[in-house]
């Protein structure tokens, strides 16, 4: 007899199953709510994502928008989603979160699929975190692998999905994600790995970047090409699987070679000393964290055209100085004659780690012939140096002595040596390589707009990487004869004129404080007797400057010089001030000469034009006091304080004084007289005549023993100052013997006109291209009268013994020339002749 089946069994089973399911659901919901309330107090406010400011580096630009530098630990180029290629977005979604548009921040299906994949393969081949979860982790959580961190991540992701749209989440994610080499976001990664903007990436490059979030340190194409290639191919396969690309596109992208190297920020203008000024200014104003992470764009006053001109002129001139003093030998010896030469692989690897200074490259000598040498140049491989590009290399003995001219390259080069070379270029293409060396001396160059004080170009030294000390702003050096225009301006203010005669004769004065005689001398030590003030400044007559100082008075002169921004403690309280014993920076000299260039106004140098935040809003805008070109309330009043609210710069010398001083500075370049009648003469700045412009002027400066060489001058809208010297103040610039192997060789003692002026001339030749000649108008209250060249007195003669001269009205001579020349020598108020 069969047992009776329990007809209620299926019903009971279903009931039990439902009860069990309900219990599981209740437990699940309870667990979820329990987890939620447990972590609720620790959950961040995701609403902050609406106003999130991604950590973005500070960028420094020229006034015309050329990138100079980027500062900040994290490289990031924030982009709008619409600025990103569609293929890039699809590649990331296909690889990181294929169900991105179907879930609400947390994807149970994705987790289940990943779990089965782990069980099947024994390894975590698929990620379980959605893009939103990754965003939550990147913004609010650490990377530690703990259950509670994962729980928080899920809840935060759900909150994010409620707050932001899918497009907004994607944009944040693609700008936030770390992709290796300090690059955060796809914009920075495209620049770092390929030197491109994201819109210019190929499909293969897009896939490579999209594959980086999984392991940015080990799968990037710089660290491992093989791993990066494999990961790229996985991304391409996922894009094909999701039907984002065709099979033909897939095959073409897989066939792309992986060609990647590190690209820093794409610097468009070499101005590192200016960049450092901007960086320090930003840190002082906003604090270090805000300066480096808030994405500020700093626009400096630098003009890219003028900065490039200054870079070229300053470095060319410094290397020309260095080369005429001789070759100091190779940087080091890599292998000796009895040793095997290095392989190309060794050379390439070694030289890749050696610094490059501007356009100066390290190289290894491979072989040497009588009139040529074969070298391996960093980044350029095998190159040849011709004889004409190295025959300058006579031996350096000391700063004053050089060896004989070389007759063969074997005299100074040998295989195995590491040397330095520079390219010769034509129309941007390299045509040859020239032997050079890292200079021992250094240089500075400053260009300033005299209308408002904007520093439009600045070179602080030979190379910022080589030495970060900024000689343009920090190096306080004796200025030599550069100080004389300011002393002569004081003399004009005292009542002297351009025609005043000062005795150009030796001085022999006992100095009780030193217990010895003081004998200032001209350089060269030649004397012309009674000489007009114009000639005295133009030819830089030392003894005349001392006598002019005596007439004005030492204390009065020092006080007068403070009008130009010089400090009293920078100006010695002795007559040596007339010879340039005062010490100033190149920027101070540019500021001082700006007063002459702008008709008498004192402008403050500044470097930062404006600061913009990442949204384009202006955080700071410079408001410099500018020169007044119309009727202003600004009056000259012995440098008295003027209205601080005025937009105009204070007037510190009269327009007439500035004009007459410019006349003397003009003569420093163009001289005077008539060469055809033997009355012609040159000033110490005669080399600037090469510019063929009559709207320029300046003054040389050479200190005792030629330790410092200066040229300070102006042109329309520009004041330029060039300095050359050694950082070691005890070392002088020396002298050179003639070298017929150097084009335009200059021999003899180094000086302002020989050592610094060529940099000024080259700069102005580039800066003034397409700038028409602009003569300043003669001011009111200036008269022009005919005088005798020798005496400075009035004359009726129309021959070469006469000339026209400018005077401030009321100071022109009233007396006509006589035969008694000595009677016209300027005398002091006490009636004593200035001898």
What spans do the regions from the language model cover?
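Short active-site loop at a secondary-structure junction
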Residues: 77-82, 399-410, 438-443, 466-486, ...
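Short, well-structured active-site flanking segments
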Residues: 101-111, 184-187, 246-250, 469, ...
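N-terminal type II signal-anchor transmembrane helix
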Residues: 1-61, 99, 118-119
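Conserved catalytic neighborhood of penicillin-recognizing serine enzymes
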Residues: 120-145, 199, 266-267, 451, ...
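Active-site SXXK
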Residues: 92-93, 239, 310, 370, ...
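A penicillin-recognizing enzyme superfamily signal
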Residues: 300, 304-307, 311-313, 342-346, ...
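Mid-domain, small-residue-enriched loop/turn segments at the edges of structured enzyme/sensor domains
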Residues: 517-521, 553-591
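Non-catalytic, structured segments within soluble enzyme domains
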Residues: 32, 123-379, 562-563, 567-568, ...
